Amino acid sequence: MFVDQTKIDVQAGKGGDGAVAFRHEKYVPLGGPAGGDGGRGGSIILVADSGLRTLMDFRFRRKFKADNGENGRIKSQYGRGAKDVRLKVPMGTSVYDFNTGELLGDLVENGQELVVAHGGKGGRGNIHFATPTRTAPEIAENGEPGEFRTLRLELKVLADVGLVGFPSVGKSTLLSVVTKAKPKIAAYEFTTLTPNLGMVVLPDGRDFSMADLPGLIEGASKGVGLGIQFLRHVERTKVILHLVSMDPNNGRDAYEDYETIRKELAGYTKDLTTKKEIIVATQMDIPGSEEKFAEFKKKLGDKTVYPISSVTHKGVSELMGKTADLVEEVAKEEAEKPAEIKVAEKEYVYKKPEDEGFKVERTGEHSFVVTGNKLERLVQRTNLDHTDGIMLLARKLKRLGVDEALRENGAVTGDDVSIADFTFEFVD
């Protein structure tokens, strides 16, 4: 089954907690702190694989979680970092943040990687908190939480040339003639339900990839028929071959069909109408097709149209030669200008939430909630199992102005104050 879009949840691993430990060895009377750092949590990484053609692997499994880093140990031993989880996706996969719609990256090259959820950093052990006046600190950091993301994966077929047109205009037949692809061909509409991909190799050694896309109908850009779910595949093509049937028995107006498909392409995105296009008049072997072709060509005006028959192969070689010329022309133009798509680097780094200060909110007669990215991260990273850690947190909150802000909002000694999942008693 061809699956070209899906939604997945990715949860990176939490960093290991730093340890509070001390040396207890003979002949080392002063000992000292010896708590090691926690290991980094595992990240979730998407990897483009040229051997995949669909997002089928994500149809039934949509939640992925990396392991947490190990906690720090005694004798200054660091915790082991967790292994990253690498998920293979087809080349041509676009990755979006499901909640914001932001394009995180396009995986268009084999082996290209995109880090979609970073593992949390390991917390520091108490060996890092010793000072001349604090020689035995019972202070350590908790590991950072791993990032969680809900992603939308969208596959856009990577092909140099896309075949578009109404159903039953001969797209699959043409693909089967010029490539080794074996698409399903039958005398009824919507025979092609998924994109088919093939490689065209010309006698002069030039080659290009070609995709047969499911037939479009009026309203496709608004979701009618197979519609919008396949229009996205046209986006990555360099050249569009617009096939129009010259069968005089189908009861259709060829020029109206051509204009309708052009409107649907524009309705999806204006970019599609700026792509290089070759108009192809198909099924020219059918009696009466010449008259219909003459009328069609007249209505097109000065636009060039290539008449072909995939049955007799008449005109096909000339068409493929012209197509190869256009593919090379577009490739040269693209090489001379900056890439317009956002390509994922080897590692994509999410922006840390901006520190927008903090906000104090009274939630009851004697209760307050303090919110703010920086404060919440500070509380999450502080090991509150030891008195030294709690006192260090209290000093940091005071320096950041939290105590003063609570007083200004009417807090008095004994009131409850909550930051993230930590609640403490305010002391003025």
UniProtKB/Swiss-Prot annotation:
Keyword Magnesium among UniProt keywords: yes
GO molecular function: GTP binding; GTPase activity; magnesium ion binding
Cofactor(s) annotated in UniProt: Mg(2+)
E.C. no: 3.6.5.-
Domain Obg intervals: 1-158
Any one Gene Ontology BP term: ribosome biogenesis
Domain OCT: 350-428
Protein's UniProt keywords contain Glycosyltransferase: no
InterPro entries associated with the record: G_OBG, GTP-bd, GTP-bd_Obg/CgtA, GTP-bd_prot_GTP1/OBG_C_sf, GTP1-OBG_CS, GTP1_OBG_dom, GTP1_OBG_dom_sf, OBG_GTPase
Family assignment from sequence similarity: Belongs to the TRAFAC class OBG-HflX-like GTPase superfamily. OBG GTPase family.
Purpose: An essential GTPase which binds GTP, GDP and possibly (p)ppGpp with moderate affinity, with high nucleotide exchange rates and a fairly low GTP hydrolysis rate. Plays a role in control of the cell cycle, stress response, ribosome biogenesis and in those bacteria that undergo differentiation, in morphogenesis control.
The protein's name in its UniProt record: GTPase Obg
